[in-house]
From Swiss-Prot:
Residues 1-30 are annotated as: Disordered. Residues 20-30 have a biased composition (Polar residues). It comes from Mus musculus (Mouse). It comes from the Eukaryota. This is Host cell factor C1 regulator 1. The lineage of its organism: Eukaryota, Metazoa, Chordata, Craniata, Vertebrata.
Length: 120
């Protein structure tokens, strides 16, 4: 069984609706202090719940999506240049060794002269 709302601890209080004769209906709004009843989870209840779900995006289960402003402006003319990159994890111990020796490390990829552009 699942509790819908935690029960309050403390001295018992009288329900003001008990003296006025108001009964709790299915659509009546509940006060935040009033504990809710336990729900019995049966196979039929679960089958009913899952049969109402949909795999398609035609049922709004939550609020409408929020659109955020673009983080970057859209590219006006995309560039077809290729960037070669290697994970530097294996180069870190070598760089530390060279720093201890006082040497300047040579770049792994030699710099290409300006004007050499690789296009796809």
């Amino acid at each position: 069984m699942i509790l819908q709302q935690p029960l309050e601890r403390g001295p018992p209080s009288r329900d003001p609706r008990a003296t006025t004769g108001v009964t709790r209906g299915l659509n009546a709004s509940l006060s935040p202090r009033e504990p809710l009843h336990k729900q019995f989870l049966s196979e039929e209840n679960m089958a009913t719940h899952f049969s109402r779900l949909s795999l398609h995006n035609d049922h709004p289960y939550c609020s409408p999506p929020v659109t955020f402003p673009e983080a970057l402006p859209p590219l006006r003319s995309p560039c077809p240049e290729l960037l070669l990159w290697r994970y530097p994890g294996s180069l870190i111990p070598e760089a530390l060794r060279l720093l201890r020796l006082g040497d300047t490390p040579s770049p792994y990829y030699p710099a290409s002269p300006a004007g050499d552009i690789v296009e796809l």
